[in-house]
């Protein structure tokens, strides 16, 4: 009878009786294609020259390709260079040189931005003007200090008061009523001594006049404030904050919100124009008819005559100034392609006034303070009578309500953009605000809050999908924190008057330490204050103004100071998570005493790295520099080893929503893509754990990866092993002595023959377990030839021209084989064509299909698994054979037989195309070994055997 043996690829499963005829114990330099064997050839376009720098091979890391260029990114001697597609060096100046302690983990790109992930952080390089411009891990944070100007005089309304005008403007605005003092006020008795020094209620407003007086005072305040705001100036307290505006409009690296105490503790200072400092019978003297002189903006005096109850408003009318405190502006200039401006945002005016309540009284000697000067005062005298010591007592929020109002202020509106080219170091300038923006501030663009963009990121790898950079295996280095010059205004006096020894209450800030409660334990960050360490800061500022850290996990801030005697002093403030802002802060209510926060010691050690190994950070679309909050996802509890995408939906009928897979130490996870391009949900799909991240390879509709027991692919939601046939021990080829001896060198052999025999011996000697091989190999997808190549990149001890054994998987035929390839340095999957680089620096682009025009003669060998010709296992004899092939070169065939499937007996070596009669012994089992010489156009289809059964069972 005849048996046709069609070969099925490499198989190492232990049970010889379970495998089909045609399975192979050895398949070297041959691969299965459409059911036939053909030479295993790596075809493609070689680069015209190897990648070398001064004779040193540059290892290819990435192919940076856009519609306009294709560059090979490679590393040599810890420096990254770029090469043109032909292999020529693009520039002798490296893109980036690394310390020898750092190593590059991955390289990716989005548009013209190259992203280099290294052990020392994330690095960037922008292509433009014929070269790459290196950018460090983060833009420098330019420290800007804000302050306010002196008050501007203005032509305020006189509100019915008879007053001489001036083109130079005045500092006060008036409002006169139609009532006399007796119509409006009830006088309150004050002890004489207290009336000279204490803040006391001195006048109350009669109940029937409270509404009218309240309306008159607010009319005075509102029209004056509107005039100031229309000029782009400020009259009340507010917060200011700045951030970087990126090329795509994103906002990053927000500053601390800085509270500008234009006037504290009250929001407005409105004074009685009728009440003097004099008293009669412990009652304040008031005057319906009073004339005095005031000064205009240049000190010229003019007359004012009061006829009825009147009030004057001493408003703050100030510019917002800014100062660049460091030299980082020059460093920021390097980022001008990414950072387009420094945008400044403010809040609407914040007051402690409760406008729902009526004004009921006035107080004597009530003190307000203004930033930069201290006590706020405006009095007038005439004939020994002084007015201006009695101020309107505005109904106000409770202390707690005002504190909460300040803490929960979260809406910041844009009033100014500063171009990087306009920034000047160490120079105080007026902030060029948009006047209309200040007047209608709540209609302006609102600041989008920050989420940890000051932190430095470290990753184990990167993956670009959907124009977004995905970083995985994360660590973050916490931001060192803002120093005092960024958190506090740039003016150091606030609560100041002549009765205080102010130097006793001023401190030089040396450093600021913040503690954070993280998943990695308590962390400490430290910021040295080089600027404020030379300045005496009002203790009132330190205790009451904002202390902020841009991370809600922060719980304490310790400020280390020097007092006026140069003694070390430490103040520790509790930080509370902000309700709206991403951060934690402490802020007083302008009654806090700094001494209550004083401590003897604060022990810490700087520890600022947080492990985030199960996080994936996804950037904004087409912006590899910014990772928004909604792009940060947690995947399981393990460490993410790699990411890959698939093009097929995991659930048929759904919106293709799980295109990205994360390979973690606790399994494989699928991530759902939201309409915004970020990942809205994450689901586990397999317990399989990838054991070799270099094996993760995207195929057309699946992803391939290696585990410690197989190489598998995940398609849809199913994980399928591709290497079950390789899970077993290798066959002892040395038991086939005659076959093995054929490839030993003889004296008559030419160098070419010896080289060929050495290659065959290398294939025979490859006894490495494929499963172990998968743990160290690099996998690439040869799309043109529909096969997977598993390449050994660990053969560092071999010469660059030596051959190494690789594994090949034919996707069409589901068949494995081995083949020889020149010693591989690395290989990368770069859509649409992979690249192989050999250890001599030469590079092959696998951009061609199988070359059927190649006239080179290739050599290959196969050894079958046990051949069985009947189920009864009775002895048979092989009496003839025919080779079915298209080659003109005749194969050499060795036949072996066995009765126990263990010990193999040599039957013979046959060199003809066919044989009709062969005298052989009878055996239950057989093996065939073939040595073939084939050109690329040739195929070996099958071996047809003539079988005669010698014995049968009775």
Regions found by a protein language model. Give the residues of each.
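Beta-sheet-dominated scaffold domains
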Residues: 3-6, 109-113, 468, 645-854
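Exposed low-complexity, polar/acidic, P/S/T/G-rich flexible segments that act as propeptides
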Residues: 344, 850-857, 871-885, 933-954
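Short Trp-Ser/Thr-centered turn/loop motifs at beta-strand boundaries
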Residues: 249-280, 284, 525-532, 543, ...
């Amino acid at each position: 009878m005849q048996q046709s043996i069609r070969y099925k690829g490499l198989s190492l499963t232990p049970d010889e009786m379970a495998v089909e005829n045609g399975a192979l114990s050895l398949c070297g330099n041959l691969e299965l294609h459409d059911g036939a064997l053909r030479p295993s050839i790596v075809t493609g376009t070689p680069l015209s020259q190897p990648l070398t720098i001064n004779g040193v091979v540059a290892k290819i890391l990435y192919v940076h390709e856009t519609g306009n260029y294709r560059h090979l990114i490679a590393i040599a001697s810890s420096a990254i260079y770029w090469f043109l597609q032909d292999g020529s060096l693009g520039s002798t100046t490296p893109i980036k040189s690394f310390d020898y302690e750092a190593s590059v983990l991955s390289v990716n790109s989005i548009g013209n931005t190259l992203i280099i992930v290294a052990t020392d952080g994330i690095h960037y390089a922008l292509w433009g003007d014929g070269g790459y411009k290196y950018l460090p891990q983060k833009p420098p944070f330019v420290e800007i200090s804000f302050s306010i100007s002196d008050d501007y005089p203005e032509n305020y309304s006189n509100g019915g008061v008879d007053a001489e005008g001036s083109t130079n403007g005045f500092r006060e605005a008036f409002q006169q009523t139609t009532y006399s003092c007796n119509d409006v006020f009830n006088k309150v008795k004050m002890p004489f001594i207290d009336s000279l020094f204490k803040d006391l209620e001195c006048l109350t407003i009669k109940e029937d006049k409270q509404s009218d007086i309240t309306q008159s005072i607010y009319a005075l305040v509102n029209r004056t404030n509107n005039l100031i705001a229309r000029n782009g100036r400020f009259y009340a307290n507010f917060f200011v904050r700045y951030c970087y505006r990126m090329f795509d409009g994103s906002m990053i690296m927000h500053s601390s919100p800085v509270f500008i105490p234009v006037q504290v503790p009250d929001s407005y200072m409105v004074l009685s124009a009728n009440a003097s400092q004099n008293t009669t019978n412990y009652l304040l003297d008031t005057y319906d008819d009073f004339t005095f002189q005031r000064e205009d903006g240049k000190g010229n005096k003019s007359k004012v005559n009061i006829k009825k109850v009147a009030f004057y408003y001493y408003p703050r009318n100030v510019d917002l100034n800014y100062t660049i405190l460091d030299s980082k502006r020059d460093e920021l200039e390097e980022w001008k392609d990414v950072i387009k401006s420094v945008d400044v945002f403010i809040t609407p005016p914040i007051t402690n006034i409760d406008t729902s309540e009526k004004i009921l009284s006035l107080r004597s000697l009530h003190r307000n303070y203004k930033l930069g000067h201290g006590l706020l005062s405006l009095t007038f005298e005439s004939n020994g009578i002084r007015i201006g010591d009695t101020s309107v007592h505005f109904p106000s929020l409770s202390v707690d309500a005002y504190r909460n109002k300040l803490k929960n202020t979260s809406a910041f509106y844009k009033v100014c953009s500063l171009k990087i080219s306009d920034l000047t170091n160490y120079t105080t300038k007026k902030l060029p605000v948009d006047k209309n923006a200040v007047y209608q501030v709540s209609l302006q663009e609102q600041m989008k809050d920050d989420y940890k963009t000051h932190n430095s990121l470290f990753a184990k790898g990167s993956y670009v999908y959907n124009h977004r950079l995905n970083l995985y295996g994360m660590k973050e280095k916490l931001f060192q924190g803002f120093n005092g010059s960024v958190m506090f205004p740039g003016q150091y006096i606030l609560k100041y008057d002549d009765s205080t020894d102010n130097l006793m209450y001023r401190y030089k800030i040396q450093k600021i330490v913040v503690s954070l409660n993280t998943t990695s334990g308590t962390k400490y960050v430290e910021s040295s204050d080089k600027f404020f360490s030379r300045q005496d800061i009002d203790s009132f500022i330190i205790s009451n103004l904002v202390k902020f850290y841009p991370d809600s996990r922060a719980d304490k801030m310790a400020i280390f100071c020097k007092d006026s005697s140069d003694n070390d002093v430490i103040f520790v403030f509790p930080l509370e998570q902000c309700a709206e802002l991403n951060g934690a802060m402490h802020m007083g209510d302008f009654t806090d005493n700094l001494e209550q926060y004083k401590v003897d010691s604060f022990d810490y050690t700087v520890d600022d790295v947080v492990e985030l190994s199960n996080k994936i950070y996804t950037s904004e679309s087409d912006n590899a520099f910014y990772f928004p909050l909604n792009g940060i996802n947690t995947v399981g509890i393990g460490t993410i080893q790699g990411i890959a995408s698939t093009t097929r939906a995991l659930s048929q009928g759904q919106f293709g929503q799980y295109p990205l897979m994360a390979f973690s130490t606790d399994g494989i996870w699928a991530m759902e893509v939201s309409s915004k391009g970020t990942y809205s949900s994450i689901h586990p799909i397999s317990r399989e754990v990838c054991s070799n991240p270099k094996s993760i390879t995207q195929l057309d509709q699946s992803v391939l990866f290696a585990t410690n027991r197989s190489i598998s692919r995940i398609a849809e939601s199913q994980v399928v092993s591709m290497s079950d046939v390789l899970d077993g021990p290798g066959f002892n080829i040395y038991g086939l002595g005659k076959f093995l001896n054929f490839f030993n060198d003889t004296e008559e052999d030419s160098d070419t023959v010896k080289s060929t025999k050495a290659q065959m011996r290398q294939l025979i000697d490859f006894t490495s377990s494929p499963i172990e091989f998968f743990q160290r190999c690099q996998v690439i997808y040869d799309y043109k030839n529909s096969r997977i190549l598993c390449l050994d990149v660990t053969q560092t001890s071999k010469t660059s021209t030596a051959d190494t054994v690789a594994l090949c998987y034919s996707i069409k035929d589901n068949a494995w084989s081995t083949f020889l390839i020149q010693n591989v340095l690395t290989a990368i999957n770069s859509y649409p064509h992979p690249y192989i680089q050999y250890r001599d620096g030469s590079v092959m682009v696998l951009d061609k299909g199988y070359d059927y025009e190649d006239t080179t003669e290739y050599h290959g060998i196969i050894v079958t698994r046990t051949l069985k010709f009947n189920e009864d296992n009775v002895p048979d004899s092989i009496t003839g054979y025919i080779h079915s092939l298209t080659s003109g070169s005749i194969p050499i065939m060795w036949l072996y037989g066995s009765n126990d499937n263990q010990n193999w007996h040599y039957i013979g070596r046959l060199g003809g195309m066919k044989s009709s009669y062969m005298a052989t012994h009878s055996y239950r089992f057989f093996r065939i070994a073939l040595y073939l010489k084939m050109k690329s156009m040739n195929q070996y289809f099958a071996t047809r055997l003539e079988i005669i059964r010698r014995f049968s069972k009775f």
